[in-house]
């Protein structure tokens, strides 16, 4: 069920270059269950910026009534969000969308988690929940450069973890797809979130396998009303799906990337 609440900022810190970890508390956390879902945050009390910012859930802690969101400062909206201090209130709408299907990974099976840049955060809660279900988790995380790397140790706590950087300044040089091939990583199910070229490469490479992709799209309303985030369905010029309400997670081949 979608709710709305002025959640309280518990803490905020920079964890990598232009990347922030924001912890919020509130009753809305009780409704957050699916890894891969997101929230829509109003970053300022004023009307400018008008639109909310869609930010994925990184961690859900029902006992503490807290959730963690990791985001990257890109423009005016996220710059305003970086100024939030403990005790401040933030207008939050959510949880939104459909997350990663946990049942696709059998207990004792092997799940490969592939993240690129700011697509890494939602995979953390996924890794945690899969590990709790007895799934063997392997993570491949890609970043532009060493300064952008975050949560390596956190993912490593759940299983084998590989880091790739575009410039080779940390971990393995190259793309996440290079790491998968070079390391010969096998899987029963693959979950991924990141830039569209990365998702497209995974879609093409592993078509026909159990692969689930979380799309990152600009959106207006977050609830399927404004049609700002639609993507086409293969084989049709008129059919489409909405990333915010039908997704953001889709099975590989379900939508055109």
From Swiss-Prot:
Chain ranges of the FAD-binding FR-type domain: 2-102
Cofactor binding mode and count: Binds 1 [2Fe-2S] cluster per subunit. Binds 1 FAD per subunit.
Binding residues annotated for [2Fe-2S] cluster, in chain numbering: 221, 226, 229, 244
Keyword Transmembrane helix: no
Gene Ontology MF: a single term: electron transfer activity
Residues the record lists as binding FAD: 53-56, 70-72, 77-78
Pathway info: Pyrimidine metabolism; UMP biosynthesis via de novo pathway; orotate from (S)-dihydroorotate (NAD(+) route): step 1/1
Gene Ontology annotations of biological process type: 'de novo' UMP biosynthetic process
Keywords: 2Fe-2S, Electron transport, FAD, Flavoprotein, Iron, Iron-sulfur, Metal-binding, Pyrimidine biosynthesis, Transport
Cofactor(s) demanded: [2Fe-2S] cluster; FAD
Tagged with keyword Transport: yes
Entries under InterPro entries matching the protein: Cbr1-like_FAD-bd_dom, Cyt_c3_hydrogenase_gsu, Dihydroorotate_DH_ele_sf, Dihydroorotate_DH_Fe-S-bd, Dihydroorotate_DHASE_ETsu, FAD-bd_FR_type, FNR_nucleotide-bd, OxRdtase_FAD/NAD-bd
Family: Belongs to the PyrK family.
Subunit and partners: Heterotetramer of 2 PyrK and 2 PyrD type B subunits.
Entry function: Responsible for channeling the electrons from the oxidation of dihydroorotate from the FMN redox center in the PyrD type B subunit to the ultimate electron acceptor NAD(+).
Protein name: Dihydroorotate dehydrogenase B (NAD(+)), electron transfer subunit
């Amino acid at each position: 069920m979608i709710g709305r609440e002025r959640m309280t900022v518990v803490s905020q810190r920079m964890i990598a270059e232009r990347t922030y970890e924001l912890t919020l508390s509130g009753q809305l956390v009780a409704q957050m269950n699916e890894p891969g879902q997101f929230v829509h945050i109003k970053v300022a009390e004023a009307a400018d910026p008008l639109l909310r910012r869609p930010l994925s859930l990184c961690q859900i802690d029902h006992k503490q009534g807290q959730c963690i969101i990791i985001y990257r400062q890109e423009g005016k909206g996220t710059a305003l969000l970086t100024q939030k201090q403990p005790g401040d209130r933030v207008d939050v709408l959510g949880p939104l969308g459909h997350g990663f299907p946990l049942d696709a990974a059998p207990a004792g099976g092997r799940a490969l988690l592939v993240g690129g840049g700011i697509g890494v955060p939602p995979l953390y809660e996924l890794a945690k929940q899969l590990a709790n279900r007895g799934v063997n988790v392997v993570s491949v995380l890609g970043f532009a450069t060493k300064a952008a790397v975050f949560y390596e140790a956190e993912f490593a706590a759940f299983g084998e973890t590989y880091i790739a950087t575009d410039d080779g300044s940390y971990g393995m040089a190259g793309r996440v797809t290079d790491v998968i091939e070079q390391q010969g990583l096998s899987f029963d199910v693959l979950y991924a979130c990141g830039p569209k070229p990365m998702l497209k490469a995974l879609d093409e490479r592993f078509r026909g396998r159990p692969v689930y992709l979380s799309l990152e799209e600009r959106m207006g309303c977050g609830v399927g009303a404004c049609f700002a985030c639609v993507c086409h369905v293969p084989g049709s010029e008129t059919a489409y799906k909405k990333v915010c309400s039908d997704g953001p997670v889709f099975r590989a081949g379900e939508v055109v990337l």
